[in-house]
């Protein structure tokens, strides 16, 4: 699988938060090697490839698990229950919570607006979006528009690396698209 756990750090306090830890061991090894404490675990949604490391990381570091209130019964170890449009602020971490249903009904995006970083989980990928498992196509469309409304300089971090496979799907549907052809060449390098 090409799941991507992402981390943010506070260099002064030697603390970090991780978004969607699919597994614990690589994160534990990295943080211990760097002498960094994992303070927060942020979950965009309940799928196992995004929460698989929650319990082991919480046990290892005493981390605080953060997730969407309406999905709390499906997120193991959850401690902080977030609402749509809430500003979550803890230590030096600050993010606006954006409810983005479609892939799942309880999916959220963490928008670290001061740093201009958004963690979209499985809502948005490079050249694609997540599958609709629980939500509707209308919800996904609205969710993608919420992400689209973020400032242009916002860096988007998605939950998986599917760019090459998504590009193959796109080029089948638009074989004469020169911009897409250039993008595929860049991806393959």
Task: Kindly give the residue locations of the regions a language model identified.
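Active-site HxH/HxHxD metal-binding segment of metal-dependent hydrolases
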Residues: 16, 23-99, 116, 183-186
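Single conserved hydrophobic/aromatic residue that forms the stacking wall/gate
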Residues: 1-12
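Conserved hydrophobic/aromatic beta-strand scaffold that supports enzyme active sites
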Residues: 18, 87, 109-111
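Pocket-edge positions in alpha/beta enzyme catalytic cores
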Residues: 3, 16-19, 132
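Metallo-beta-lactamase
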Residues: 104-189
């Amino acid at each position: 699988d090409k799941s991507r756990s992402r981390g943010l750090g506070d260099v002064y306090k030697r603390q970090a938060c991780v978004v969607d830890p699919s597994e614990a061991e690589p994160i534990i090894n990295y943080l211990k090697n760097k002498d960094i404490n994992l303070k927060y675990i942020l979950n965009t949604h309940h799928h196992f490839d995004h929460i698989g490391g929650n319990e082991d990381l919480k046990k290892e570091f005493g981390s605080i698990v953060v997730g969407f209130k309406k999905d709390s019964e499906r997120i193991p170890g959850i401690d902080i229950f977030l609402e749509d449009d809430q500003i979550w602020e803890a230590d030096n971490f600050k993010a606006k919570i954006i409810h983005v249903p479609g892939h799942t009904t309880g999916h959220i995006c963490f928008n670290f607006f001061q740093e201009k970083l958004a963690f979209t989980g499985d809502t948005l990928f490079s050249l694609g979006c997540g599958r609709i498992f629980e939500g509707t196509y209308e919800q996904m469309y609205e969710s993608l528009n919420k992400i689209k409304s973020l400032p242009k300089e916002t860096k988007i971090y998605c939950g998986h690396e599917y760019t090459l496979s998504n590009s193959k799907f796109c080029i089948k549907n638009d074989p004469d698209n020169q911009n897409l052809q250039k993008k595929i060449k860049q991806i393959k390098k």
